[in-house]
Amino acid sequence: MEEIQRYLQPDRSQQHNFLYPLIFQEYIYALAHDHGLNRNRSVLLENPGYNNKFSLLIVKRLITRMYQQNNFLISTNDSNKNEFLGCNKSLYSQMISEGFAFIVEIPFSLRLISSLSSFEGKKIFKSHNLRSIHSTFPFLEDNFSHLNYVLDILIPYPVHLEILVQTLRYWVKDASSLHLLRFFLHEFWNLNSLITSKKPGYSFSKKNQRFFFFLYNSYVYECESTFVFLRNQSSRLRSTSFGALLERINFYGKMERLVEVFTKDLQVTLWLFKDPFMHYVRYQEKSILASKGTFLLMNKWKFYLVNFWQCHFSLCFHTGRIHINQLSNHSRDFMGYLSSVRLNPSMLRSQMLENSFLINNAIKKFDTLVPIIPLIGSLAKANFCTVLGHPISKPVWSDLSDSDIIDRFGRICRNLFHYYSGSSKKKTLYRIKYILRLSCARTLARKHKSTVRTFLKRSGSELLEEFLTSEEQVLSLTFPRASSSLWGVYRSRIWYLDIFCINDLANYQ
């Protein structure tokens, strides 16, 4: 971010915040490329992208062609091969989109830095812990056990392409940049299959992820504007959690003491939002709006959101995408966990003088479980086991060395144990560990043209020792003096603040 400010500071007064000239600067593509290298990779290491094709020479030739306004670059014909340098035309479009996405993020980033600087007295607030996905679950543990009903919401779809452009008009004042954005949406990609998908979960192609993530995040930010409005109207303290955090894939907000809200034109009181306990959480396209209120209040919230999104985005939003559920009677799939609020019955004996009474006291507890069936389905899709959970070999990795095979299987197991460390029951994780361990052994036996039993007898268990005890080694390093209580710590729920994305196997959708 300091590099961006250094490049932009001399030109801000002259360009009047115009972003379009930056697309002709070479350093923009270099910064976008370096930023892409720093993103978290898949554990399967199968997403090389275009980083190996990046070259400043190609960037210079690309900028020269844009200056010359060569129509061949933007022509839509059957040939996908560019005669200039023999490069694919999709590579040029991808590089332009990466640079453009990096440019249009600048107003959001500068606005975020200025708001955080003023909030902390010119000292930028570091919110790395809030970026972690696991930071959401302690919030759910502390608050959801006291609530009654929840709205399970799916972000509305589809949205017209022009709506996305109009949404960015409030942030990007440069008309040329908006025209270029409109050109990208209509000419280069079929956006209807990427952002306006009718599938339960949104999926992005491996190409141009930065560009589409930016569009999707800006669209979701606009969808949540109603919560931001109510939060700012009802509280004297300005909330920083609702800033345009471009690098975050999730955020949570808490709305307290939502009192009477008056509209500017009609001066009508919105009594349905008078709820002292309202909590909102979102990850990707799924949102949760929980309340301590009654079913009638949640039903009002539901129809308000449906009408608001239909009028604001000019789309047909079905009420079936919002479900009202009671927390104590329903388990929800959220962020790779099956979350629920269950009642723990407990008997208390109370004695008064010579009389004693038995009191049945039920305590609500927030519970998180590992969804075993979808997780086994993900392992089967990745060819680690069958759909019934029987381990099989992975022949694609048979050409690797023994250490690389063990390292890949061990890394997948460690990542899954790391992400699902907050599970209330670890028995499911040990079943996943058994599948990966036996799949690793069968892959090694296939490589050496032997059976699993013969291979283990000949090689011993040294090759799998690190794979078998990886999580115990992590805990032993964290708690070196804890010997008897080590397993007690491991069986308890642990939330980590260094998880910024869901693993491909954890995100089974």
Swiss-Prot record:
Principal location listed in the UniProt entry: plastid
InterPro entries assigned to the protein according to its UniProt record, in alphabetical order: Domain_X (IPR024937), Maturase_MatK (IPR002866), Maturase_MatK_N (IPR024942)
GO molecular function: RNA binding
Record keywords: Chloroplast, mRNA processing, Plastid, RNA-binding, tRNA processing
GO-annotated biological processes: mRNA processing; RNA splicing; tRNA processing
Top-level taxon: Eukaryota
Keyword tRNA processing: yes
Subcellular location: Plastid, Chloroplast
Cellular component, GO annotation: chloroplast
Family the entry assigns: Belongs to the intron maturase 2 family. MatK subfamily.
Protein function: Usually encoded in the trnK tRNA gene intron. Probably assists in splicing its own and other chloroplast group II introns.
HAMAP family: MatK (MF_01390)
Name the UniProt record assigns to this protein: Maturase K
Source species of the chain: Nicotiana paniculata
Classification of source organism: Eukaryota, Viridiplantae, Streptophyta, Embryophyta, Tracheophyta
Gene that this polypeptide is encoded by: matK
